[in-house]
Amino acid sequence: MVTTLSYTQRAEAHPSPLAKRLFTVMEQKKSNLCASIDVKTTDEFLSLVDTLGPYICLVKTHIDIIDDFSFEGTIVPLKKLAEKHNFLIFEDRKFADIGKTVKNQYASGVFKIAQWSDITNAHGVTGAGIVKGLKEAAQETTDEPRGLLMLAELSSKGSLATGEYTKQTVDIAKTDKDFVIGFIAQRDMGGHDEGFDWLIMTPGVGLDDKGDGLGQQYRGVDEVVAGGSDIIIVGRGLFGKGRDPAVEGERYRSAGWNAYLKRCQ
């Protein structure tokens, strides 16, 4: 059963400080839009973040794509833009190893993701230890709230994240109520009758294109929000093919918000 509660109502009752903060930002900005910004230079990345910042609740990064990445040159300015425009940061790392390994990958190395990314995500393929390892890394790295999304479903053609795999990933999410805040999924993942209020973030959302020739399949905004998505993840629809990111940012923000208001009625 898809929830009809408002983001404000969900913020008030949610056990996760990070989810509370995200719901609050969404309500303040009247936005359930996450911008997925996959570009190869820091300058282009920061420019797009600054332009799209007013329209989004969340920016999604693949930080290892950036050729000239540096903590001081890329992350410090990104954090300043997050403060300026009031959005959160989601590093789409898709962790998929045993607990001890992901703990080090999350906290250490070149990217030090746990230091700056409010949200990250993980596959369920290695079992519940992945949640424990990532949570320990977050707690040992920062006093700021952090949240984890489990990858329950993907938007790519032929994805193996279906059926029993999806069900077991949901079971892994149930092992931690305050750190696991939700799923990357195409629909509502249930759990309401057991006291869970999971955020559903959905990639592969487009107002124009139906696919990209490389397996991505796009679905409409109204369809995914009506089906239980709380946050729509949009990438090339915002800035690809010569699009104006400010125009598209407002277009997708408005479409996403109106779809949410319809769901709440």
UniProtKB/Swiss-Prot annotation:
It comes from Cyberlindnera fabianii (Yeast). It catalyses: orotidine 5'-phosphate + H(+) = UMP + CO2. One of its GO terms (cellular component) is cytosol. InterPro entries: Aldolase_TIM, OMPdecase, OMPdecase_AS, OMPdeCOase_dom, RibuloseP-bd_barrel. It comes from the Eukaryota. This is Orotidine 5'-phosphate decarboxylase. The lineage of its organism: Eukaryota, Fungi, Dikarya, Ascomycota, Saccharomycotina. Its EC number is 4.1.1.23. The gene is URA3. Pathway: Pyrimidine metabolism; UMP biosynthesis via de novo pathway; UMP from orotate: step 2/2. Signal peptide: none annotated. NCBIfam families: pyrF (TIGR01740).
